[in-house]
A protein has these predicted regions:
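Catalytic phosphate/metal-binding cores of nucleic-acid and nucleotide-processing enzymes, i.e., regions
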Residues: 1-110
Length: 110
């Protein structure tokens, strides 16, 4: 296994643990991630897809992954998506486009 794949798998496992702890939903890695019709890296949160990223270039991760996860949202047929970006020291941030944030906000205000 190449080092980038190993790093990505580790980040996905860690993200699933973080999301399980924070949300109370049992979140797991989607082992079919990265294939055509990709539906995201993590499943277990109802009506939501999650993309995980541990790029060295965090700026790139924050710009690219939220756009990519939009395609995964359509593939999965879910209403909500988020990108989780790992920072040094195991710190995580959830990144959304303004449109993704608005979708979440409008649902919360219902």
């Amino acid at each position: 296994m190449n080092p980038n794949k190993r790093k990505g798998d580790k980040a996905e496992r860690e993200a699933a643990e973080v999301l399980t702890k924070v949300t109370g939903f049992e979140c797991k890695r989607n082992l079919a991630a990265g294939i055509p019709d990709d539906v995201g890296d993590i499943y277990g949160i109802p009506n939501c897809g999650v993309q995980v990223c541990d790029y060295k270039d965090k700026n790139r991760a924050c710009l690219v992954k939220p756009r990519e996860v939009e395609t995964q949202r359509k593939n999965a047929g879910v209403d909500f998506v988020a990108s989780m970006v790992r920072f040094r020291g195991g710190e995580w941030r959830v990144v959304l486009t303004p449109e993704q944030f608005n979708t979440l906000l409008q649902a919360a205000l219902q």
